From Swiss-Prot, chain A:
Listed GO biological process terms: proton motive force-driven ATP synthesis; proton transmembrane transport
Organism listed in the record: Oncorhynchus mykiss (Rainbow trout)
Name the record gives this protein: ATP synthase F(0) complex subunit a
Lineage: Eukaryota, Metazoa, Chordata, Craniata, Vertebrata
Pfam families per UniProt: ATP-synt_A
Reactions accelerated catalytically: H(+)(in) = H(+)(out)
Compartments reported by the entry: Mitochondrion inner membrane
Length: 223, 105
C-alpha cells in the first residue's frame, strides 16, 4: 500500500523516453534568447526585468570575486523556480522531487565554495569554524559542532526535495483519500485542496529562492 | 506552379497527396541534424507567430503549457488508468485505508 501513495513520484516511460526528460527540457523553451532589438517582446521584457532585479539583489553582499558566480546562481534560480511551478500543473512531473537531482545540484556547488575558500584564503576559511568571543573552555566542543555544521550543508538539496515532496503528497492524499471518503463534507475538502494549492505555489517559489540564497551565503564566506 | 511534378521530398506537407504520404516520409531528413533542424524550425515558427509579437498576451505561453499538460497526461496514461475513485457507498468502511483500488496488472 505504501507504494501506491508514492506512485506520483515515479517517472513513467513512453516510447522509451521517461517523462523526466521532457520535464527537464521544458524550462529551456520557456526562456527565449533576447534578440538584438532595442525593445523585445513582452515575455522577454518581463523575464529580463526579473533577472536583473534578482541578480542585483543577490550580488549585493558578495565581493568582486563572488560576482563570477552571477550567471550560475541566476540560472540556477530560474531553473528551480520554473521546475517547481511547472510541477503544479495537473498531470505533470516535478523533477525536483527526486533526491538525485537535488543532491546533484547541491553537493558540487557546496563543495566548490568550500574548496575555493580553502584554496584562496585557508586561514579565514578555517577561522569560520570558531565564532568570535567564545569562552575558552568551549572551544573544542564548538569546533566539532561547527565542523559538523559545515559538512551538513549539502542538506540544501534534501531541503528542496523534502519540501516539494511533502507538498505534493499532501495534495495527493487530500484528493485521493479525503475526498472520496467524505462526500458529504466534500466542500470542506475542496477548500482544503484549494488552500494547499496556494501554499504549494508559495512553497515552490520560496524553496528555489532559499536554495540559491543559502548557496550565495556559503559563497560569501569563502570567496 | 503546384503541379504534381515536384521532387517528392521537397514538397510541403499540405501539398502532398494522401497516397504519397509514405514515400514523402521516407524522403524527409531523419538524421540527428535534420531532426534538430526541424525542431528548431517548428520552435521558431511558433515563437514568431505567438510570442515574439508587439502585444503578445498570455495566450502564447498558455497554449504551450496546456500542450505540455496534455503531453504529460498521454505519457502517464498507463499509470493513471489504474486509479479508481472510491466506488462504494458502504458506510461500514474497514479501518485499513484500502482507498486506491488498483486494477490487476
Amino acid at each position: 500500500m505504501t507504494l501506491s501513495f508514492f506512485d506520483q513520484f515515479m517517472s513513467p516511460t513512453y516510447l522509451g523516453i521517461p517523462l523526466i526528460a521532457v520535464a527537464l527540457t521544458l524550462p529551456w523553451i520557456l526562456f527565449p534568447t533576447p534578440s538584438a532589438r532595442w525593445l523585445n517582446n513582452r515575455l522577454i521584457t518581463l523575464q529580463g526585468w526579473f533577472i536583473n532585479r534578482f541578480t542585483q539583489q543577490l550580488l549585493l553582499p558578495l565581493n568582486l570575486g563572488g560576482h563570477k558566480w552571477a550567471a550560475l546562481l541566476t540560472s540556477l534560480m530560474l531553473f528551480l523556480i520554473t521546475l517547481n511551478m511547472l510541477g503544479l500543473l495537473p498531470y505533470t512531473f516535478t523533477p525536483t522531487t527526486q533526491l538525485s537531482l537535488n543532491m546533484g545540484l547541491a553537493v558540487p556547488l557546496w563543495l566548490a565554495t568550500v574548496i575555493i575558500g580553502m584554496r584562496n584564503q585557508p586561514t579565514a576559511a578555517l577561522g569560520h569554524l570558531l565564532p568570535e568571543g567564545t569562552p575558552v573552555p568551549l572551544i573544542p566542543v564548538l569546533i566539532i559542532i561547527e565542523t559538523i555544521s559545515l559538512f551538513i550543508r549539502p542538506a540544501l538539496g534534501v531541503r528542496l526535495t523534502a519540501n516539494l515532496t511533502a507538498g505534493h503528497q499532501l495534495i495527493a492524499t487530500a484528493a485521493f483519500v479525503l475526498l472520496p471518503m467524505m462526500p458529504t463534507v466534500a466542500i470542506l475538502t475542496s477548500i482544503v485542496l484549494f488552500l494547499l494549492t496556494l501554499l504549494e505555489i508559495a512553497v515552490a517559489m520560496i524553496q528555489a529562492y532559499v536554495f540559491v540564497l543559502l548557496l550565495s551565503l556559503y559563497l560569501q564566506e569563502n570567496v | 506552379e503546384r503541379d504534381g511534378r515536384f521532387p517528392l521530398g521537397e514538397k510541403r506537407l499540405m501539398d502532398v497527396k494522401l497516397g504519397e504520404l509514405g514515400s514523402w516520409l521516407g524522403k524527409r531528413d531523419f538524421t540527428p541534424n535534420g531532426v534538430l533542424a526541424s525542431i528548431r524550425n517548428g520552435h521558431d515558427r511558433y515563437y514568431n507567430k505567438y510570442i515574439n509579437v508587439k502585444k503578445g498576451g498570455i495566450g502564447g505561453v498558455a497554449m504551450l503549457l496546456v500542450g505540455y499538460v496534455a503531453l504529460s497526461y498521454m505519457w502517464e496514461y498507463d499509470h493513471l488508468s489504474e486509479y479508481r475513485l472510491w466506488e462504494y457507498d458502504d458506510l461500514r468502511v474497514p479501518t485499513t485505508y484500502s482507498i486506491i483500488h488498483l486494477k490487476a496488472l
